[in-house]
Amino acid sequence: MASPSAEPPAFARAVAGLRAPAPRPEILLEEIAAPQRLAPYAFALSATVLRSGDEVAGGRLILLHDPAGHEAWHGDIRLVTLVTAELEADLADDPLLPEVAWTWLTDGLAQHAAAYTAIGGTITQTTSTRFGELAGPPPTADLEVRASWTPTADDATAHLLGWCAMLASTAGLPPPGVALLGQNQRANTP
């Protein structure tokens, strides 16, 4: 990886956009070591999503930059993500879950006017049932979103915001400013 002083301006602008603060207090962002072999320049963030103090989802967002461009990317900057979340078992059985989970990403990007091209990815849903020495806890279900896309502008702030919106949807967080019924309400009993 090249030294920071030698970073191309397009990469530096994209990194600056990804260093914007998280739009929600439930989403904790942290810079992590980026993969070194995927592109000449790379930057990475990890995210932890908390609900009532418990981790309910997590992910990584990796920015790749190849000044020479990359034919498959349709550009010289690429964003790559992996997001995972534990689900309620009944949600994991929903046949529409993959399509809905994909729209969490595309809607999040659209909501923040994050223009892109060459988007692609996979949605994986798994259910685990424990047996033998591991028996006891109820079955668990997990969702995994792997995706990548090419921003059409160097400023990645809108892409960060769209990705955070997808994280919030994946984690089942209500929209900002909306409380779920039964939460944050005072009892009306004397």
Segments from the language model and where they lie:
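Glycine-rich, often proline-containing surface loops adjacent to acidic residues and nearby aromatics
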Residues: 74-89, 139-148
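Mixed-charge, glycine-accented linear interaction segment located at domain edges/termini
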Residues: 146-190
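Short, internal acidic amphipathic alpha-helical interface segments
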Residues: 95-133
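A glycine-rich, hydrophobic loop/mini-helix early in the fold
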Residues: 44-84
